[in-house]
Curated annotation (Swiss-Prot):
Its membrane topology: Lipid-anchor
Name of the protein this chain belongs to: Basic membrane protein A
GO annotations of cellular component type: membrane; plasma membrane
Originating gene: bmpA
Compartments in which it is found: Cell inner membrane
Length: 339
């Protein structure tokens, strides 16, 4: 009888040790996704969510989603760690500092961040960053905007001015100038990625100033701008961002500058789960060449001839015949060289 009890006890210990929280050796790995804002932004955060959902379809994982805000980043990350996450994804540049802090405090945890803003400081070995050459896709849509504008005036509507949005802005402006050196470009920022009404207000003013095409990179503010274009109707057009946003206003969204953060997330997470390896301590950069940034083909708005021009430009960018600017300094250099 004592031997039977001992065997039962030993089996219980083995079961508990094997079913412990979160490691790739356990039956169901746990992947967490933390964002600033909401998942239903129809843009950046939603793209990340779609990417990790595809991972969930392919692998048997437990998915934990967390909507956060700046005053609770660290405590929310601590909660995800305590919940047994194997890999924690942080979505957006606002997590840049806390990602490093969390990684240094928890060397046994694995972290990955989308769009970090890091200098040349070393990155912890248990942290990896995904960056994007969004300017390459924006160059193509800027070219399209300049070619299609009837008024000769186009606009850019940004959320918060900074390195990430600058890549879209200056890529877009460079592409437009490459297509038409005389094109007039107006740029406005609303100071937020979560203010739909501000986006509506600024877009309304821009359209009233005879701007007929706006490229947005403003989160929910951009959704507001799309609403305005749809309400104003014919002659008021917009370029979406991150994902194909044509479904929001099929007659007004010409194209979208795609920055498929979901694809980048999917590629890295799938490889991590397949190989049980983690290549941390570095940044991984994606652009046109990797098929992660680009533009949406829309034969309803973009002619076959114009599409061929865009494909030619894409090849030049991939082959480094054109180096697309991502900030003011490189933009001014680009203008001197090409315009």
């Amino acid at each position: 009888m004592n031997k039977i009890l001992l065997l039962i006890l030993l089996e219980s210990i083995v079961f508990l040790s094997c079913s412990g929280k979160g490691s790739l050796g356990s039956e169901i790995p746990k992947v967490s996704l933390i964002i600033d804002g909401t998942f239903d932004d129809k843009s950046f955060n939603e793209s990340a969510l779609n990417g990790v959902k595809k991972v969930k379809e392919e692998f048997k994982i437990e998915l934990v989603l967390k909507e956060s805000s700046s005053n609770s980043y660290l405590s929310d990350l601590e909660g995800l760690k305590d919940a047994g996450s194997d890999l924690i994804w942080l979505i957006g540049y606002r997590f840049s500092d806390v990602a490093k802090v969390a990684a240094l405090q928890n060397p046994d945890m694995k972290y990955a961040i989308i769009d970090p803003i890091y200098s040349n400081d070393p990155i912890p070995a248990n942290l990896v960053g995904m960056t994007f050459r969004a300017q390459e896709g924006a160059f193509l849509t800027g070219y399209i905007a300049a070619k299609l504008s009837k008024t000769g005036k186009i606009g850019f509507l940004g959320g918060i001015e900074g390195e990430i949005v600058d890549a879209f802005r200056y890529g877009y402006e460079a592409g437009a100038k490459y297509a038409n050196k005389d094109i007039k470009i107006s740029t406005q920022y609303i100071g937020s990625f979560a203010d739909l009404e501000a986006g509506r207000s600024v877009a309304t003013r821009m359209y009233s100033d005879e701007i007929d095409i706006i490229h947005h990179a403003a989160g929910l503010g951009g959704i507001g701008a799309i609403e305005v274009a749809k309400e104003l109707g014919s002659g008021h057009y917009i370029i979406g961002v991150d994902e194909d946003q044509a479904y929001l206003a099929p007659d007004n969204v010409i194209t979208s500058t795609t920055k498929d953060v979901g694809r980048a997330l999917n590629i890295f997470t799938s490889n991590h789960l397949k190989t049980n390896t983690f290549e941390g301590g570095k940044l991984i950069n994606y652009g046109l060449k990797e098929g992660v940034v680009g533009f949406v083909r829309n034969p309803k708005m973009i002619s076959f001839e114009l599409e061929k021009e865009i494909d030619n430009l894409s090849s030049k960018i991939i082959n480094k015949e054109i180096i697309v600017p991502s900030n003011k300094e490189s933009y001014e250099k680009f203008l001197k060289e090409f315009i």
